[in-house]
Amino acid sequence: ANGVGVDTPASTINILNWLAEAGVGLGSESRPEESQALMAQLLSGRSNDPESFHLRPLAYLPLNHYLRWWEKLTPVARALIEQRWGSPEQAVDLEEKGFAVHGLLLGHVAVLIQPSRGYDPDQISDLHSPDLPPPHRYLAQYLWLQEVHGTQLMVHVGKHGSAEWLPGKSVGLSEACGPGLALAPIPHVYPFIVNDPGEGSQAKRRGHAVILDHLTPPLGRAGLHGSLLSLEALLDEYVEARQVAAERCAVLEQQIKQLLQGLDWPSF
């Protein structure tokens, strides 16, 4: 749920609060006030997790709506997608009502989960693939934003999403390049960590994004906490007991085993 160096759910809540202060209607009943509530609402519906596919999505983009857009694409663009995913009618992610849109609708604001770039077990490879075209549902969700929801401003929260990594040219994108197919002519704002100008430039150059740099998070000394901190103390005491108080070892061993069982770890 987090972008690099930013708490994405908490940042999304902040953005929603700023929009509300600016007079944007967010609804009154279902608006989450904190990040845990936001994530709970998102995960109560359909997400990219296959185990959630029995849940209802936010909406559907009907196939006939998608086909009207599809027929306007260049033959080159259609061929690139069809070679990997087949025609829209053959799409593995097509349902009876159309292509599913995953997320929440809060008044005039849609908070969506970016679609998966592919359906391979190794999602990381799909995310960064220079050759994998976007599936039909990926394109359909962005089309829903543009033509059904009527989005006037799009915000991708945190480094980095997948739209700017879709196949195509590095600069001077053509009508067949993936980012242009997905993002459409919608103003695009992208909060991005300041210490990665290279990938920020990628989003700016290929995703027509206005980059809003944010600082890196403050650093702190890492350490153990909770049960792990107690385990460390018991292990230190056990090492000392083996040297000076062997009779104490049996008691410590039992305490360590109980703690490991509580952590659901195998004991010795």
Residue ranges of predicted features:
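Ligand/cofactor-recognition surfaces for anionic moieties
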Residues: A1-F268
